[in-house]
């Protein structure tokens, strides 16, 4: 009986060690950019300034915090999440970024509002430490 109990305990411990841990990954939200090319993939990992400049432009505004967020591609990369253009008010917000089983999992929230008189493209850009650059990015809507 003792051997069976020891065996079962060992199996449980071994199995629990193989379960992927979910580790939060720090990120910074990039502000004051606009989409240049609206025909982009819905999730985009960008690792260089030239690639970033191909998809996004600077949208500086006057006043406090009017400058675009600085991105240093020697130490960072970005993940952008875009939705199709819409004439509805749409809020797109990152919830968290986690590392799990060799992947980065980007969770986000979408809130759809009333119809507008204009068309806009909801998006956000997050800045992530370059040490996570090799990870594949998957997404999860909450």
Question: Language-model features: where?
Answer:
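Exposed, flexible binding/inhibitory loops of compact, secreted disulfide-stabilized domains
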Residues: 17-142
């Amino acid at each position: 009986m003792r051997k069976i109990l020891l065996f079962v305990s060992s199996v449980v411990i071994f199995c629990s060690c193989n379960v992927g841990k979910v580790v939060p990954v720090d990120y910074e939200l990039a502000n004051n950019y606009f989409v240049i090319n609206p025909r982009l993939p819905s999730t985009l990992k960008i690792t260089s300034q030239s690639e970033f400049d191909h998809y996004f432009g600077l949208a500086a505004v006057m006043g406090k915090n009017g400058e675009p967020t600085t991105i240093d591609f020697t130490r960072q990369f970005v993940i952008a999440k875009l939705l199709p253009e819409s004439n509805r008010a749409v809020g797109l917000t990152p919830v968290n970024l986690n590392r799990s089983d060799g992947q980065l999992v980007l969770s986000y929230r979408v809130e759809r509002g009333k119809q507008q008189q204009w068309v806009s493209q909801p998006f956000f850009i997050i800045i992530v430490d370059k040490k996570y650059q090799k990870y594949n990015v998957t997404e999860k809507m909450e």
